[in-house]
A protein has these predicted regions:
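Short, glycine-rich nucleotide/cofactor-binding loops
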Residues: 93-103
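Contiguous, well-ordered alpha-helical segments that form the cores/surfaces of helical PPI scaffolds
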Residues: 104-108
């Protein structure tokens, strides 16, 4: 487990995780309860609680972004990282990066504001877009940092994908496992005691913690939230075709490996009022970060590096939860006051209809099926197996798109063609011309 600060009382991490089961099962068998402010309800996978007025825990925690003294919290961050400067060799910290605009913000803060010398690490999704490839190279070039890239064998990656799709109905697990463990392995191997992440998704969406808790990444939170309680070791159980040595990349370091490393993983969002949209747009303007239209949403910054996330993964999310990634984006925008709840409802309905009428990203799903060597029928069978048979959706009529909604959607930067125009995945590609 990554080291966390010790207190004399129950640590925030433990306090939050004690109620994991209760939160995760909260909506099961209960009447549907929707937040009075955002679009989330009590079926949220991270779990939501509601106050007496019907406001969800995610909205309550988000309110801290306007109530906390963030200048003071930045000072706390500066004090926190000071002991790590030059303490163990060349690198002060490890930073996991992806090819999206907000990772420019992470580097801008860590290197330009805090004065740390980071080692960048990036785990290859195998589904890279040209936009993502270009952003990743631009990050390395702009901030003049060393970077370690981890690319698994395509054959092994596909074997892991088949296992997680058949066992958990997930196409995102292989990347999440690698993305969350590769930085820890590098930190242990290179004796770098600090890992810096942008934000903690359960806190940003469902208010799992207060920013005052200053929660840190641990093995347990990764297991519960990122990996759906399914570890790399589970991949080789039963009738799996995978061998032990093929899943080592996805396995968390052992307690013995971690014992002497004293590695901790912190989230910048505990010290900065994290706003993915605002920060991304600042980075587009300041450093030339790239943005592109994604299927299924108006957001041109989130996961523009991954052709499967906003297509196949989004289709699975809709099947499993009844809503797509666009709801996450809309809830964020409601909370920041950039769209009204009524307009968000209308916009979500329009995307739901578009998803239904286009066959649920059928072109992009077929691209994935061809890559993995499976049929659409086999995929649908797995969806039925994991999430129940799909019934015909009854969609409420989408409201006519108003000029205000059109302006809202067009307010997002577009510096490259839509990622859906790309006809093949890039494993390793050329990002910059020199």
């Amino acid at each position: 487990m990554l080291a966390t600060k010790q207190t004399s009382t129950l640590a925030p991490e433990a306090a939050g995780l004690q109620s994991i089961a209760a939160r995760a099962t909260q909506g099961i068998g209960q009447p549907l309860q929707q937040c009075r402010a955002c679009l989330y309800d009590n079926r949220h996978p991270f779990g939501l609680t509601f106050d007496d007025t019907g406001l969800c825990s995610g909205c309550t925690t988000h309110a801290e972004k306007t109530s906390l003294d963030w200048a003071a919290r930045l000072g706390m961050l500066e004090k926190l990282v000071q002991p790590y400067k030059g303490c163990k060799g060349n690198y002060d910290c490890v930073i996991p990066v992806r090819g999206t605009a907000e990772y420019f913000k992470v580097l801008d803060v860590v290197k330009n504001q805090l004065g740390l010398n980071p080692l960048l690490v990036s785990f290859n999704s195998h589904f890279n877009s040209q936009t993502g490839i270009q952003n990743l190279d631009l990050i390395r070039d702009t901030f003049d940092c060393d970077i370690l890239l981890k690319t698994q064998s395509p054959t092994v990656y596909k074997k892991i994908m088949r296992e997680t799709l058949s066992r958990r109905g997930s196409v995102h697990w292989p990347f999440l496992a690698g993305h969350t463990v590769w930085p820890v392995r590098v930190a242990v191997q290179h004796d770098i005691p600090l890992i810096i992440w942008p934000f903690h998704q359960p806190t940003e969406q469902s208010g799992m913690f207060s920013y005052l808790d200053e929660n840190e990444m641990t093995r347990r939170s990764r297991h519960e939230y990122d990996l759906m309680q399914f570890e790399a070791e589970d991949l080789v159980s039963g009738e799996s075709l995978l061998r032990d040595e093929e899943v080592l990349t996805s396995a968390y370091p052992s307690d013995r490996e971690l014992a002497g490393a004293s590695v901790r993983g912190i989230y910048l969002a505990n010290y900065l009022p994290w706003d993915t949209r605002q920060y991304s747009e600042e980075m587009v303007s300041k450093f030339g970060a790239q943005a592109a239209e994604c299927p299924g949403t108006f957001d041109t910054y989130d996961h523009v590096d991954n052709l499967v996330y906003m297509s196949v993964h989004d289709a699975i999310k809709r099947r499993k939860l009844g809503y797509g990634r666009v709801r996450d984006h809309l809830c964020r925008e409601i909370r920041f006051g950039r769209i009204s709840r009524d307009d968000a409802v209308a916009l979500e309905a329009s995307y739901a209809k578009a998803f239904a009428y286009t066959g649920g990203h059928s072109k992009l799903k077929q691209q994935f099926f061809d890559w993995l060597g499976m049929t659409a029928q086999a995929f649908e069978w797995l969806m039925d197996y994991h999430f129940g048979r799909l019934h015909q959706l009854t969609l409420s009529p989408a409201l006519a798109t108003t000029s205000a909604l059109s302006a809202f959607q067009e307010g997002y930067e577009r510096t490259r063609p839509p990622i859906a125009d790309q006809d093949k995945y890039i494993i390793i590609g050329k990002g910059l011309s020199v």
